[in-house]
Amino acid sequence: HPELGDETIAVVFFMDLGLKRCQQMFADLNRYAVRPSKSLGVLYDQRDEKAELARLVVMRAPFFKDIVEMEKSSLSLRSRKLFTLSAFYSATKSLLDGINQDERKEEDADTAIEYWEEVAKQFPEWKMVHDRKMVAGEVRQDFIHSHGIVLQALGSVGNSLLRENKTGWKRKLKSLKKIDWSRNNSKTWEGRAMI
């Protein structure tokens, strides 16, 4: 392409002061220019305590590490992931809203991991995707429990349970198994989680 010989591009150089600093600059620069995916912003943002907490939870929970897409904010039908980091970030933020304290990051991460792992036990399809016995795209297509809005709602439910019932919340989550989460159950989900 000889026509590219006359083109110019702007280049900005920054001194490399370490990986965290470079990632923060990436988050700052790209957040206001051509916006990166929300998940990529959450992945690299070093200032947002909630983003750091969401990353910590995903990285420390082997189950979620395998089913959360860290960079993209939308999932293709062929993606092996069930959730995006941005959806998991919003859900974990809802879960710990008013409960967590930034200076107790490790405790907050442990609480979130315990909660999300217990939630995962209520959805056999999640485990089947994790174990590669089901295709993630089909689960996302056929069930609403793998949608970001439901994940965030589960975070809000967890927030209420953790505030009101510190000892019996795991037992209460077992009720999730009794719900018909299929998209075909439009009588329940139409107008609530589906349009």
Task: Give the location of each predicted region.
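Accessory terminal alpha-helical modules
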Residues: 2-195
